[in-house]
């Protein structure tokens, strides 16, 4: 298995610190709002990577944190007249709802930064003691010049950063690139007691501390969105390695942005969507398959038209699964016949190809193509004459390959019938209202999905083709 390591900017053989085990840390949400589709891609991508590692036999300890104290949270809490804790509690609950709806598996642990104050204060104290941090008026800063390899993850040059970085320059700092690891209390902000007075941690130190306390000095994978590479992940490396003298993370994985209608997503452009808004209109399978239809390191473009195309493609897959489920009830031959054994063995090539694609830096786009190829093959060769054992094997294989991607796990019968009956009702209503364009559109859309309507004296009937 090979993974692309942002730290070295190349694909590397994936060799874990302990054979068969993976320690993985993913930067989670700041819990002051619902997560948007850009966040959703990050969560889906690393959920998929975790699932695939487990599919390949690894025992994965998967930590994804909640940032439940930072400037955005304080601002939002003050605006709505709540406490930061109340705000965090509320949006952690909302996160779990949306993540569950998106079929994201629960982490081994979702630590909250505020649960680790004692450990964070110890972390900061150790950095001061080792000469990597200094205190001024209750604020503690990390000295970037003291850490010789600062910039190794992002490829940034410290001198160039000092000249051109858009940072808040604090004249009290020894160097413009030094960053806060402990912030003194300001009016209206929550604070904790520390050796430097009342205050709260900086964002970067929170993740370093949680990773250290839950996974140890060195971890296998640290992951997050590409926007976190600098300064967040760069600063995590500096703090962690300055404290322990050991490599913080062996492999760094970063997922790319989601653009909306070929533009960067922003509220000012009115192209900002939360995952919840999309999940009200589309099933989780659709959104997951869309998010995984491009390589995780490549930006993807989001639009409703592309989601509709993904839904149509997914419907074709589910139609095939539905046909296999029906065959399972209808076929009369129970056991695998001799002539079917060779075909069953041939189907293994799809599993091997799928693993080959996913082993190459988790190429989900090509893995999905392999599933389509498998289903095309099965549609042609598995029929009413096949044995029940072969039909069941093909169904199980399709679901097996879909599982690491978090798709194709639903039983199709009830949900498909319910959806089609609902669309038939909408078409009948349109016909009564003489809205022929809408009626024809519904009929044509169903036909594209392999569903043919027949108008009979007894009413509308449908069948799959």
UniProtKB/Swiss-Prot annotation:
SUPFAM superfamilies: Anticodon-binding domain of a subclass of class I aminoacyl-tRNA synthetases, Nucleotidylyl transferase. The keyword Zinc applies. Keywords: Aminoacyl-tRNA synthetase, ATP-binding, Cytoplasm, Ligase, Metal-binding, Nucleotide-binding, Protein biosynthesis, Zinc. A motif ('HIGH' region) lies at residues 29-39. It is found in: Cytoplasm. It comes from the Bacteria. Binds 1 zinc ion per subunit. It catalyses: tRNA(Cys) + L-cysteine + ATP = L-cysteinyl-tRNA(Cys) + AMP + diphosphate. ATP binds at residue 267. Coiled coil: none annotated. GO terms for biological process: cysteinyl-tRNA aminoacylation. Its EC number is 6.1.1.16. A motif ('KMSKS' region) lies at residues 264-268. Zn(2+) binds at residues 27, 207, 232, 236. InterPro entries: Cys-tRNA-ligase (IPR015803), Cys-tRNA-synt_Ia_DALR (IPR015273), Cys-tRNA/MSH_ligase (IPR024909), CysS_C (IPR056411), Rossmann-like_a/b/a_fold (IPR014729), tRNA-synt_1_cat_dom (IPR032678), tRNAsynth_Ia_anticodon-bd (IPR009080). The keyword Mitochondrion does not apply. GO terms for molecular function: ATP binding; cysteine-tRNA ligase activity; zinc ion binding. Its cofactor is Zn(2+). One of its GO terms (cellular component) is cytosol. PANTHER family: CYSTEINE--TRNA LIGASE, CYTOPLASMIC, CYSTEINYL-TRNA SYNTHETASE. NCBIfam families: cysS (TIGR00435). Belongs to the class-I aminoacyl-tRNA synthetase family. Monomer. This is Cysteine--tRNA ligase. It comes from Clostridium botulinum (strain Okra / Type B1).
């Amino acid at each position: 298995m090979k993974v692309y390591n942002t730290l070295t900017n190349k694909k590397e053989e994936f060799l874990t610190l302990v054979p068969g085990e993976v320690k993985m840390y993913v930067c989670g949400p700041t819990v002051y709002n619902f997560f948007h589709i850009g966040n959703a891609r990050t969560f889906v991508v690393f959920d998929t990577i975790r699932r695939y590692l487990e599919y390949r036999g690894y025992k994965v300890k998967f930590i994804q944190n909640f940032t439940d104290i930072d400037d955005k949270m304080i601002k939002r809490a003050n605006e709505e007249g709540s406490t930061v804790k109340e705000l965090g509690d509320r949006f952690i609950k909302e996160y779990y709802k949306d993540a569950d709806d998106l079929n994201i598996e629960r982490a081994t642990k979702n630590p909250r930064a505020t649960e680790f104050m004692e450990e964070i204060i110890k972390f900061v104290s150790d950095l001061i003691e080792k000469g990597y941090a200094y205190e001024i008026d209750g604020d503690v800063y990390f000295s970037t010049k003291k850490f010789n390899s600062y910039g190794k993850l992002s490829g940034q040059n410290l001198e160039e950063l000092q000249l051109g970085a858009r940072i808040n320059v604090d004249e009290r700092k020894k160097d413009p690139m030094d960053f806060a690891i402990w912030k003194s209390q300001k009016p209206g902000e929550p604070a904790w007691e520390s050796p430097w007075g009342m205050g709260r941690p900086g964002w970067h130190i929170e993740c370093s501390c949680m990773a250290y306390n839950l996974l140890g000095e060195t971890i296998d994978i640290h992951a997050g969105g590409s926007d976190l590479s600098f300064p967040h992940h760069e600063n995590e490396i500096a703090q962690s390695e300055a404290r322990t003298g050991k490599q913080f993370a062996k492999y760094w994985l970063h997922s790319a942005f989601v653009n909306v209608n070929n533009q960067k997503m922003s509220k000012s452009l009115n192209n900002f969507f939360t995952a919840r808004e999309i999940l009200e209109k589309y099933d989780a399978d659709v959104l997951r398959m869309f998010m995984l239809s491009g390589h995780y390191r490549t930006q993807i473009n989001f639009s409703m038209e592309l989601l509709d195309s993904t839904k149509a493609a997914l419907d074709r897959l589910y139609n095939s699964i539905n046909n296999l489920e029906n065959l399972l009830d209808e076929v009369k031959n129970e056991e695998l016949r001799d002539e079917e054994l060779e075909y069953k063995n041939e189907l293994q090539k799809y599993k091997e190809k799928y693993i080959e694609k996913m082993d190459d830096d988790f190429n989900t786009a090509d893995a999905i193509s392999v599933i389509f190829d498998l289903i095309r093959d099965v549609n042609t060769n598995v029929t009413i004459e096949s044995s029940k054992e072969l039909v069941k094997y093909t169904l199980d294989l399709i679901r097996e390959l879909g599982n690491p991607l978090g798709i194709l796990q639903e039983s199709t019968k009830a949900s498909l019938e319910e959806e089609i009956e609902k669309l038939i009702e909408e078409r009948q209503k349109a016909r009564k209202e003489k809205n022929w364009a809408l009626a024809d559109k519904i009929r044509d859309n169903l036909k594209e999905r392999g569903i043919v309507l027949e108008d009979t004296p007894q009413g509308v009937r449908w069948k799959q083709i």
